[in-house]
Amino acid sequence: MSLKEKTQSLFANAFGYPATHTIQAPGRVNLIGEHTDYNDGFVLPCAIDYQTVISCAPRDDRKVRVMAADYENQLDEFSLNAPIVAHENYQWANYVRGVVKHLQLRNNSFGGVDMVISGNVPQGAGLSSSASLEVAVGTVLQQLYHLPLDGAQIALNGQEAENQFVGCNCGIMDQLISALGKKDHSLLIDCRSLGTKAVSMPKGVAVVIINSNFKRTLVGSEYNTRREQCETGARFFQQPALRDVTIEEFNAVAHELDPIVAKRVRHILTENARTVEAASALEQGDLKRMGELMAESHASMRDDFEITVPQIDTLVEIVKAVIGDKGGVRMTGGGFGGCIVALIPEELVPAVQQAVAEQYEAKIGIKETFYVCKPSQGAGQC
């Protein structure tokens, strides 16, 4: 049963009438451009065919009822007439409440709604299950009540809800790609202007995500440290962000910087350049060059930004040994565990899967999870 069929059937059973709309919003993977977002730089994600699906209908009062199919059909209910506050017990409900509250704060006028939510974006894998939920809820209200919001505004509203209501500091990339993703394309995003450019993906190439299943522990504290080091670097160059520093300017004075800060800055500057070049390589179908750029990105994250772990490096090496120069592989996400992403010719996917199955657990003692994805369409009706 598809997520659409599941949520529609649950909706009818729970609320006693059929849903009028079914909306989806996808998760995402970032192909290249790591830790560049908060430096006002470039990222190159694509939406994936794992999504959050919501069957819904407008109500003629001011009540919101939400059922979470993936959490034992837990039901949350609140009124649009009262101040929206956090739910004491259901963390999932706070993503919904936060999005609704922030849409209200943006002076949008809408009535009540019934929703049933289900999703298959793996949680805790760094594939943006929370952003896909936020964008799906925003799109539900936009569609049901014809709100004058475009995808970028729905994305910004989701980011605001996550930062201010849920209390998790995130950049804009995850929500933006979920809202604006395009089938068979990745999206080059300028994190300063929020300008986007759709980049066609080469035919016959699979987007493979492999979760190391190594639980990230340092990610919060180390993420903040990296952010501070980047800000220190930008101040040294008297610029608002590292986006504004050229590699030539850096090379001329690198020796004057604290050595650790210098390494962090070098990663950001080279990663930004790689990301822009990667968009061109993909557009030209140059998988060999894309693979080189992904390898350079991984080495930079490992040696200059120091955010990889042995489990991740091992996974990358296993995949690289199979694909050679026929594709690319690197760590993706915040670091210290999580996932790797690979662009692989479809005919090589079984060999990669077999090599990883035979070698990773034997070397590391943890079983990986393997996802084969297609670059998918952003949020909308399904």
Swiss-Prot record:
Its EC number is 2.7.1.6. One of its GO terms (molecular function) is magnesium ion binding. InterPro entries: Galactokinase (IPR000705), Galactokinase_bac (IPR022963), Galactokinase_CS (IPR019741), GalKase_N (IPR019539), GHMP_kinase_C_dom (IPR013750), GHMP_kinase_C_sf (IPR036554), GHMP_kinase_N_dom (IPR006204), GHMP_knse_ATP-bd_CS (IPR006203). GO terms for cellular component: cytosol. It comes from the Bacteria. The keyword Heme does not apply. It holds the Pfam family GHMP_kinases_C. Belongs to the GHMP kinase family. GalK subfamily. PANTHER family: GALACTOKINASE-RELATED (PTHR10457:SF7), MEVALONATE KINASE/GALACTOKINASE (PTHR10457). HAMAP family: Galactokinase (MF_00246). This is Galactokinase. It comes from Shigella boydii serotype 18 (strain CDC 3083-94 / BS512).
